[in-house]
A protein has these predicted regions:
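Basic/polar, cationic surfaces and motifs that engage anionic cell-wall
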Residues: 1-23, 86, 90-185
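N-terminal catalytic cores of peptidoglycan-degrading enzymes
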Residues: 1-73
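A mature extracytoplasmic/lumenal domain signature
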Residues: 35, 61, 83-85, 132-134
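Short coil-to-beta-strand
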Residues: 71-88
Length: 185
C-alpha cells in the first residue's frame, strides 16, 4: 500500500464522468476502510473518501487494476473510507471503529458514489459489497479463523434508525437506493 499525498479532491460531477467512461468494464464495487488515519489516502483503492466526505482518486481511469480485495480485483473498483486505525470488530454490533472512526459524511458520500455506479456505470446496487461481505463469501470473514480475516464495514450506524448498528452493506446500499429515488445521484 503506497501513501499518495498529493491528490486533489473531485466532485460528484467529475466522478460521474469517470464512472461513465468505465461503464461496461466495472462489474463489481468493493467497499473498504483504509485502516489508517483521516487524510491518509492510499493508491490501492480507486476512490478514497476522507472524513469530511471529500472524494479522492489516484487516477481518473477506473479500469486500472488495483489490489484492494483478494481474488476480486479484476473488473472491479475499490472504494475506501479513510480511517479506522486500530479498529476492533468485537461482535459487530459493538464495533470499535478505532481512533479515526467512520463518519456520517463518509457514509453519505460512499452511498452517493454507489448510486452513481448504479445509475451511470451499469453496476447494480446489489453488486456493491463491503470487503467483509466478500470475505464471508470467500471464507475469510469474521469468525472464519483465518489469520487474514477482513471485516471492513461489517456493521455501520444507520442514521435513519437512530444510529442503530446494522449490516454495513445494507446501510450503504439502502442509502444509495434512496439517493437514486431522490435523483441526487
Amino acid at each position: 500500500m503506497e501513501y499518495a499525498n498529493n491528490m486533489k479532491p473531485v466532485d460528484l460531477d467529475e466522478l460521474k464522468q469517470y464512472i461513465v467512461n468505465a461503464n461496461g468494464y466495472v462489474k463489481m464495487v468493493y467497499l473498504h476502510w483504509s485502516a489508517g488515519r483521516y487524510h491518509e489516502i492510499y493508491d490501492d483503492y480507486h476512490i478514497s473518501v476522507d472524513n469530511d466526505g471529500r472524494i479522492y482518486l489516484p487516477d481518473p481511469d477506473l479500469t486500472i487494476k488495483r489490489n484492494h480485495t483478494w481474488k476480486r480485483n479484476s473488473n472491479s473498483v475499490g472504494i475506501a473510507v479513510c480511517g479506522c486505525l486500530d479498529a476492533q470488530p468485537n461482535s459487530g454490533y459493538n464495533t470499535d471503529f478505532g481512533s479515526y472512526p467512520v463518519t456520517d459524511a463518509q457514509i453519505e458520500a460512499v452511498s452517493m458514489i454507489i448510486a452513481l455506479f448504479a445509475k451511470y456505470g451499469g453496476v447494480p446496487v446489489e453488486c456493491c459489497l463491503t470487503h467483509c461481505e466478500a470475505a464471508y463469501h470467500d471464507g475469510y470473514g469474521p469468525y472464519s479463523g483465518d489469520e487474514e480475516t477482513r471485516w471492513d464495514l461489517w456493521y455501520l450506524p444507520d442514521s435513519g434508525m437512530g444510529g442503530q448498528m446494522r449490516g454495513g452493506g445494507e446501510v450503504l446500499r439502502g442509502k444509495a437506493r434512496w439517493y437514486m429515488q431522490q435523483s441526487v445521484a
